[in-house]
């Protein structure tokens, strides 16, 4: 029986994955095949493509594409679908990277700052980092005057900020949301 099972496995190219002890960072990569990766590349370029259009590009049935997308959503590989806006068209073309240093590194200060900063609509991204500063914020506003207003009335009113250092974008060299798989 064991020999027959091994022959069947070799003929069909099945491979088994040990789900009892997966490494979290590699588990999702192992459940994706080449077609999944191609599908994700296409979706990262344009999520408005229909399953029919995707099926033609991938040489799959519409149902197969639909099922693959649902699987990738269930697995959390596809996190969400969004519309990417043109900053210039919505008067948010002034981009600032603001480095924040807190007065202390206690859990209370970090947590308080994080709870407060996520409420600021001008802050698009916030990263807790190592090095000379504790956080880097990506802020998009209309212009320098709007940034000054933001700094004076919102950012510097947050608790536990020791210092800030702002860097302004001169030009955009690369800006992508697409991962290479």
Ranges and model annotations:
Residues 2-181:
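A compositional/biophysical signature of low hydrophobicity enriched in polar/charged and small residues
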């Amino acid at each position: 029986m064991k020999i027959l099972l091994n022959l069947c496995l070799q003929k069909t190219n099945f491979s088994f994955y040990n789900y009892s002890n997966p490494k979290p960072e590699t588990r999702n990569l192992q459940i994706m095949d080449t077609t999944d990766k191609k599908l994700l590349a296409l979706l990262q370029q344009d999520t408005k493509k229909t399953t029919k259009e995707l099926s033609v590009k991938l040489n799959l049935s519409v149902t197969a594409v639909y099922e693959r997308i649902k699987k990738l959503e269930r697995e959390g590989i596809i996190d969400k679908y969004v519309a990417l806006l043109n900053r210039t068209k919505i008067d948010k073309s002034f981009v600032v990277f603001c480095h924040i240093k807190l007065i202390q590194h206690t859990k209370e200060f970090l947590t308080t700052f994080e709870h407060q900063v996520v409420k600021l609509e001008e802050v698009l991204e916030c990263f807790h980092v190592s090095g000379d500063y504790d956080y880097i914020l990506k802020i998009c506003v209309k212009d320098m005057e709007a940034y000054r207003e933001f700094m004076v009335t919102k950012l510097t009113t947050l608790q536990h900020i020791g210092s800030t250092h702002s860097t302004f974008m001169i030009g955009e060299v690369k800006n992508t949301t697409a991962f290479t798989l």
